[in-house]
Amino acid sequence: MAKKISALQLMAGIAALSFGFVSCSTEEPSPEPEPEPEGPSPYVAKVFDYRPAAGQYVNVIPEYEEGDTQEDMNRKALEAICGDADGMISLGGFGGYVVVGFDHTVENKAGLCDFRVLGNAFYATGQSEYGNSEPGVIQVSCDANRNGQPDDAWYEIAGSSHNGTESWIQKAADAGNDTQTVRDYEITYYRPASTPTKPTKEYIRWEDNQGNSGYRAKNDTHKQPYYPQWIDEEKLTFKGTRLPQNAIDLSGQGNNFGLFRFAYGYADNVQSTLDPSAIDIDWAVDADGNPANLKGIDFIRIYTGINQENGWLGECSTEIAGIVDLHMCNIVIESAGIKK
C-alpha cells in the first residue's frame, strides 16, 4: 500500500526543489526487502500429460476451445486441479489418464497414508456401499534420475481388487457384469466420422484385446463431441489394469444404477473426506506384484479403471479434482484401518 503524504510534506518537498536544497545526509536509501520465498505446496504443481479417452465430459471439463493444443489442455487441466482451484477434469472411459507432479517429494511414512486423490464420488442416500463410484487406477513414480520428468519406472497402487475381491462381486456377476480384474488390458477407440445430433447407443466404436467390441453411447445431455478434439490421431489406444464392472441396475428398469465402491486403493471411489480415499505409498507394487519399497514419490498417473456403460448415466469415467500431500496438511490416517 502506498504511503499517504501530508500536505505539509508535499509543500516542503516543492520548496526544496525550488531552492535547490541538497541533502547532507550520507545514508543510502533503505533497500526494498526481499520477498519471502514460498514453501512447497501440498497440491499438484504440474500437469505433464492430460489424455482422456472418449467420454461424455471430455472437451467440457476442462473446456476445449477451437485451436487448443496439447499444451493448452495440460495448462487448463492444471488450472482446474491445482491448489484450492475447486475445479475438476474428466478422464473419459477406460484408460484415459492424467500425469501430474509435485514441487517436492511426497514422503512415504510407515503405517500412514501419504496422499489423497480428490474426486466427485458420493454415496446414495442412506447407503455406504454404492453411489457414484468411478474408480481410477493409481500409479506412482519417483524421480530416480533427477531430471524433473516422469520418465522413470511406474508402480501401481495395489488396490482391493488387485489380488482380492469385493463384497458386491457376486451381486454384480448375477447382474451379468464382467467381474474379472484383467492385467495388461488394452482398448482402442476410433474417431467417429461425425457427432450425432440425437442420442445413439452406437457413437464411438471400441475394440479390446479380450475379443470384445462395442460403442461409447451418445446421450441427450452432453451434445459436444466425446472424442478429444485436440488429438489428431484417428484412434486412441490405452493399456492398464481393468477393474470389475461395478454398476448394477437396481431397478431392473434401467433408471436406477448403483455404482458400488471398492474397498480401498483407487481414485474417485469414495467421498474425498473419508479415510478410504487416502493412499499409502507402501501399497505400490512392480509389474510382478512385488512391493516397490519407495521412500517417496514425485509423480502420479491416474487412469479410468472400468470399461462399462451405465444406461442413462453414461460411461464410467474417473473425475479428478486434485491431489493432496496428507503429511503437509497434518492429516494423519493409519493405513491399517483402511486395508482390512
Can you annotate each of these PLM segments?
Residues L10-I14, P150:
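A generic structural signal for short, non-catalytic loop/turn and secondary-structure boundary residues
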Residues S141-N147:
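Short loop/turn segments immediately following beta-strands, especially the blade-tip
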Residues V137-Q139:
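Beta-strand signatures of extracellular beta-sandwich domains
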Residues P31-E134, G159-K340:
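A domain-level signal for the mature, folded cores of soluble proteins
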Residues A2, A16-A45:
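Bacterial Sec-dependent N-terminal signal peptides
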Residues M1-M11:
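Bacterial N-terminal signal peptides that target proteins for export
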Residues G148-I157:
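Tryptophan-centered short beta-strand motifs
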